[in-house]
Design a protein with these regions (language model features):
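Phosphate/adenylate-binding "loop-and-lid" substructures adjacent to NTP/NAD/dNTP-binding pockets
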Residues: 89-102
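Short beta-strand-loop/turn "lid" adjacent to the catalytic site in phosphate-handling enzymes
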Residues: 63-92
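Glycine-rich phosphate-binding/hydrolytic loop that grips phosphoryl groups
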Residues: 111-119
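Glycine-rich phosphate-binding "P-loop"
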Residues: 45-52, 97-99
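A short, structured active-site edge motif that brings together acidic residues
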Residues: 100-111
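Short, well-ordered amphipathic alpha-helical segments that serve as non-catalytic structural scaffolds
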Residues: 53-64
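Gly/Thr-rich phosphate-binding beta-strand-loop-beta motif of the actin/hexokinase/Hsp70
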Residues: 1-25, 118-153
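Short glycine-rich, Thr/Ser-proximal phosphate-binding strand/loop in the N-terminal lobe
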Residues: 11-49, 143-169
Length: 169
């Protein structure tokens, strides 16, 4: 069976497709497109233009899933949409215009997903993972399978840039 996940983040939309059997998952396709949703915020709400850009990007990725013969497709979103005050409107627009329900991943689950995706990549006995995203930062202790050692901070690189960078030369 072929599965795919389309991931809406603060600075991009990405897709991964895999052939999954009882014993293994083989990645057959990956793609990423730049889309900085934070540029489309009006206050703390995603603008109509931002929603249109998001729908367009999701439809492009969904089309690739159709071309690949994907059986099951998940659309997920993290901090970029967690922070949007009009998330329910964005969710409804995405469902109506793409046919895909949005699975909103909360901060602790995002940190746990980072842990699961990276736990076998450490060659050190004690290692930490720092995932610096556009709207959140996740920190995981890769040496322990304990959710209490995984955190998600509601601050990201765009927040840090806004606070600490006055100008770029």
């Amino acid at each position: 069976m072929k599965y795919s996940v389309i991931d809406i983040s603060s600075s991009s939309i990405s897709m991964i497709a895999a052939d999954v059997t009882a014993n293994a998952a083989e990645i057959v396709y990956k793609d990423r497109a730049s889309l900085t949703l934070l540029h489309y915020l009006e206050g703390k709400s995603l603008s109509a233009r931002g929603i249109d850009k998001l729908v367009e990007a999701v439809m492009v990725m969904k089309g690739k899933c159709v071309s690949l013969g994907v059986d099951i497709l998940y659309l997920i979103a993290t901090a970029s949409l967690r922070a949007a005050e009009n998330f329910e409107q964005v969710r409804a627009e995405l469902l109506e215009r793409t046919g895909l329900p949005v699975n909103l991943i909360d901060g602790p689950t995002e940190a746990y997903c980072d842990y699961i995706a990276n736990r076998f990549y450490s060659s050190y006995e004690r290692a930490a993972l720092l995932d610096i995203g556009g709207a959140s930062i996740e920190v995981c202790d890769l040496s322990e399978d304990n959710r209490e050692n995984m955190i998600s901070l509601d601050v990201g690189i765009f927040d840090l840039h806004k606070k600490f960078v006055k100008e770029i030369h």
